[in-house]
């Protein structure tokens, strides 16, 4: 999997360490290893984009180390591949020693895994499933400002799946815990790898069923029902939250134009 990068290796380059990524001029570097000063590094091919290889090099550069969020408005396939590189880099960084016996780990030569030659344990990259749900009530959508978002953005509700839960149970629990309402008519929409740090966002739409909004102030600053044509500041394009909101707005508009509720 990992080998020495030679001068003629070319394509797109994910250079990552501690959740940061090398973004000279705000872009994912593209070109051959020689011109980018990457020849001689250890690297792995992690995918392909626009017919060219995407490479991962685990490490940092003196300048221009930034956040993957800077690529949110780029092609979604490129964003996912860059996110894959960041997650793999962090996985290998955090699995240098075996959690069972404490001996040094070795990277597998055939798959994305770390191996312990002493106790034979095998570790794979962990992914944390997370639900995210847009809730509609007539021509309104439930939006909330989270405590972790101090930029005024309002978004839909989300939360991590707990041990032993189904995705449907997680939706019901998270919505109740954060807003004190019940939902019905749950529909799967899409999913999005979200490497902040290693989530898989599983997106749903749902309809309001019962209850009055009462927020968990450890999680939310504010929450309310907003008409589809009078929305607050929203998450950026490229996020699954924005996709859910836009899909709900389209549904609200279509049903209102048809005289439905």
Swiss-Prot record:
Positions of a divalent metal cation 3 binding: 174, 178, 219
Keywords annotated in UniProt: Hydrolase, Magnesium, Manganese, Metal-binding, NAD, Zinc
Cited SUPFAM superfamilies: Nudix (SSF55811)
Positions of the Nudix hydrolase domain: 125-248
Binding site for substrate: 69, 111, 124, 192-199, 241
Gene3D superfamilies assigned to the protein according to its UniProt record, in alphabetical order: 3.90.79.20, Nucleoside Triphosphate Pyrophosphohydrolase
GO cellular component: cytosol
Any matching Pfam family: NUDIX
UniProt xrefs under InterPro entries: NAD-cap_RNA_hydrolase_NudC, NudC-like_C, NUDIX_hydrolase-like_dom_sf, NUDIX_hydrolase_dom, RNA_Hydrolase_NudC, Znr_NADH_PPase
NAD found in the keyword field: yes
Reactions catalysed, as given in the entry: a 5'-end NAD(+)-phospho-ribonucleoside in mRNA + H2O = a 5'-end phospho-adenosine-phospho-ribonucleoside in mRNA + beta-nicotinamide D-ribonucleotide + 2 H(+); NAD(+) + H2O = beta-nicotinamide D-ribonucleotide + AMP + 2 H(+); NADH + H2O = reduced beta-nicotinamide D-ribonucleotide + AMP + 2 H(+)
Broad EC category: hydrolase
GO MF terms held by the record: magnesium ion binding; manganese ion binding; NAD+ diphosphatase activity; NADH pyrophosphatase activity; RNA NAD-cap (NMN-forming) hydrolase activity; zinc ion binding
Any one of the GO BP annotations: NADH metabolic process
Nudix box (motif): residue ranges: 159-180
Binding residue positions for a divalent metal cation 1: 158, 178, 219
Assembly and interaction partners: Homodimer.
Protein name (record): NAD-capped RNA hydrolase NudC
Naturally occurring in which organism (per UniProt): Erwinia tasmaniensis (strain DSM 17950 / CFBP 7177 / CIP 109463 / NCPPB 4357 / Et1/99)
Lineage: Bacteria, Pseudomonadati, Pseudomonadota, Gammaproteobacteria, Enterobacterales
